[in-house]
Structures are given as structure tokens and as C-alpha cells.
């Protein structure tokens, strides 16, 4: 399975709120410049009121939860899974199956901030994460141009019947907290659109279920 977490709410603090007291206080506490820290609704909520599309931004915790679920799975440990994080600003993070994401959230934030600063982590040796500019369409085309997506509008199907398909697919899941894909074509052009029910689920919940189905199909469970 190749996971693409699309339009993720992961970005550095944008310039227009660098001078907001909430941002300055957080940056000062951490010994960094405002433009070097991740935008985080839990810390920067007062400042984010000034941002466009604020409801879909500032949620690095979504990426953290998804990577914890995916990177520590049997699928990834057996080399049968690879994750890509696409951000709303068209950055892509390629995550090695060998990367063990910090379980502590603050350590994860520090790691991603280092990644934005250096382009790869660790800075020396074989990178476990790499960051580069790339839009979602280009990424999906490079991954074969065929993908499945989880979306409320999709066909409901038992997980037991999805597993073998998910195991060999590029699987797209939204990495944003509210709303729908801004790139509508992600759903419209998908080879398969899956639904896990009428109720919207957190991205990490979707990933857990999809990974489990693929692991069963691969004989890992």
C-alpha cells in the first residue's frame, strides 16, 4: 500500500501572523523565529482568526496520528507500505518505511520543523524523511496515475473485501480537519472511491482500518 495523506493541514506559521502576540510568545518560549515553527491551532488560535481558510489549517497532530498508525504497522515493518504527506501548500514529505516517528507530539513537531529547515532528516546519512516541492497531481502521476480514495460519497464495501485491493493500491486520504478536498478531481478521477459509512471519520481512524484490512489480505494477521 502506498498512502498519500492529501492536502494536509501542515505548514510553518505564515508571514502575515508572525507579529501576533500568540505566535511571538510561542516562538520566544521555544527559542525560534516565528517563521521557523509549525502553525498549530492549539497554540496559535487567536492569531489564526486572521488567516483565510483557517478551519482547515494548523493541525500537525493529524499528520502525527496518521504516521504513528501507519509507520508502526506490520505493513510498514514488512516493507509493504510507504507514506507520502502532501501539504496544502504543495510540499511533499516522503517517509521511509524504516522511519520510526517520535511518539511524543512535541518531539514530532521539532522533527518536522527541522525537516522544513533542512529538507531531510537526519541531515547526514540515509534520509528517513525528505521534503520537496510538488503538487498533488504530479505526485499521483509519478506514483502511477491510478489511485483509490476514501470519501463519504464512495461505495460501501466490507473491509474484508477491500484488503487485497488496498494492499496493491495508491490510497488517498484527506489530511485536513474540516470540509472536502479542494482538488475535486481527487475523487472524480479516482479508480475506486471507498466509504466506511455515512459518518465522517478522523484520518487516523480511516488509516487504521485500511491498514488492518491490507494486513489481513497479506497474511500478516
From Swiss-Prot:
Entry keyword Methyltransferase: yes
Keyword Glycoprotein applies: no
Site description Interaction with substrate rRNA, residues in chain: 59, 100, 103, 107
Gene3D superfamilies in the record: 3.40.1280.10
UniProt keyword list: Methyltransferase, Ribosome biogenesis, RNA-binding, rRNA processing, rRNA-binding, S-adenosyl-L-methionine, Transferase
Matches recorded under InterPro entries: Alpha/beta_knot_MTases (IPR029028), Rbsml_bgen_MeTrfase_EMG1/NEP1 (IPR005304), Ribosome_NEP1_arc (IPR023503), tRNA_m1G_MTases_N (IPR029026)
Molecular function (Gene Ontology), one example: rRNA (pseudouridine) methyltransferase activity
GO terms for biological process, alphabetical: rRNA base methylation
Pfam families tied to this protein: EMG1
EC number: 2.1.1.-
Catalytic activity: a pseudouridine in rRNA + S-adenosyl-L-methionine = an N(1)-methylpseudouridine in rRNA + S-adenosyl-L-homocysteine + H(+)
Residues noted as binding S-adenosyl-L-methionine in the record, renumbered to the chain: 174, 179, 196-201
Record-annotated site: Stabilizes Arg-59: 61
Enzyme class: transferase
HAMAP family: NEP1
Function: Methyltransferase involved in ribosomal biogenesis. Specifically catalyzes the N1-methylation of the pseudouridine corresponding to position 914 in M.jannaschii 16S rRNA.
Stated family: Belongs to the class IV-like SAM-binding methyltransferase superfamily. RNA methyltransferase NEP1 family.
Subunit structure: Homodimer.
Name by which UniProt lists this protein: Ribosomal RNA small subunit methyltransferase Nep1
Organism: Pyrobaculum aerophilum (strain ATCC 51768 / DSM 7523 / JCM 9630 / CIP 104966 / NBRC 100827 / IM2)
Amino acid at each position: 500500500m502506498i498512502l498519500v495523506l492529501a492536502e494536509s493541514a501542515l505548514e510553518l506559521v505564515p508571514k502575515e501572523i508572525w507579529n501576533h502576540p500568540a505566535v511571538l510568545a510561542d516562538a520566544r518560549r521555544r527559542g525560534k523565529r516565528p517563521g521557523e515553527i509549525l502553525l498549530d491551532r492549539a497554540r496559535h488560535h487567536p492569531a489564526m482568526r486572521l488567516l483565510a481558510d483557517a478551519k482547515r489549517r494548523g493541525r500537525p497532530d493529524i499528520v502525527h496520528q496518521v504516521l504513528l498508525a501507519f509507520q508502526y504497522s506490520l505493513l510498514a515493518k514488512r516493507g509493504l507500505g510507504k507514506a507520502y504527506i502532501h501539504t496544502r501548500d504543495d510540499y511533499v514529505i516522503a517517509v521511509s518505511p524504516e522511519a520510526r516517528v517520535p511518539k511524543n507530539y512535541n518531539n514530532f513537531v521539532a522533527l518536522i520543523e527541522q525537516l522544513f529547515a533542512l529538507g531531510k532528516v537526519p541531515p547526514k546519512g540515509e534520509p528517513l524523511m525528505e521534503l520537496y516541492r510538488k503538487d498533488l497531481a504530479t505526485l499521483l502521476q509519478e506514483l502511477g496515475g491510478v489511485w483509490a480514495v476514501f470519501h463519504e460519497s464512495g461505495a460501501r464495501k466490507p473491509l474484508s473485501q477491500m484488503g487485497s485491493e488496498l494492499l496493491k493500491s495508491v490510497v488517498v486520504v484527506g489530511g485536513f480537519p474540516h470540509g472536502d478536498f479542494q482538488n475535486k478531481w481527487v475523487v472524480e478521477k479516482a479508480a475506486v472511491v471507498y466509504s466506511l459509512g455515512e459518518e465522517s471519520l478522523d484520518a487516523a481512524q480511516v488509516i487504521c482500518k485500511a491498514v488492518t484490512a491490507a494486513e489481513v489480505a497479506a497474511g500478516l494477521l
